[in-house]
Structure formats: C-alpha cells, structure tokens
Curated annotation (Swiss-Prot):
This is Large ribosomal subunit protein bL33. It comes from the Bacteria. Pfam families: Ribosomal_L33 (PF00471). GO terms for cellular component: cytoplasm; ribonucleoprotein complex; ribosome. Keywords: Ribonucleoprotein, Ribosomal protein. GO terms for biological process: translation. The keyword Membrane does not apply. Belongs to the bacterial ribosomal protein bL33 family. It comes from Prochlorococcus marinus (strain SARG / CCMP1375 / SS120).
Amino acid sequence: MAKKGTRIVVTLECTECRSAPASEKRSPGVSRYTTEKNRRNTSDRLELKKFCPQLNKMTIHKEIK
C-alpha cells in the first residue's frame, strides 16, 4: 500500500487585488493560481511573485486555505 504523499495542492491569491479599488482593475475579481508544494521542505505559507491579469502587473501572491 502506498504512503500518503508529501506534495499538496495549494491556492495562491493576489494580495493587491483585495485592497485595490475597482477603478484600477481591468476586470472585477481576484487573481488566483494553483500550484503544488512539498509539505516537508516548505512548512510555512508559500509567497510568490506572479502576474496579476486584473491589475496588469507583477504582484505578490500568498497561499490561502
């Protein structure tokens, strides 16, 4: 029988989309990405710089539950 995997799927959400007014956005909503992380190597929350299509620029995306 196989062991439980160490890799889990996490969701990354743009931190600037939540606080930006609607006039600055190209479209309503929040930018989200899904990715995998290794639970053993990175036990803390993931934080990556990714492209946000709503704001049309690179922003910090943080892991959400």
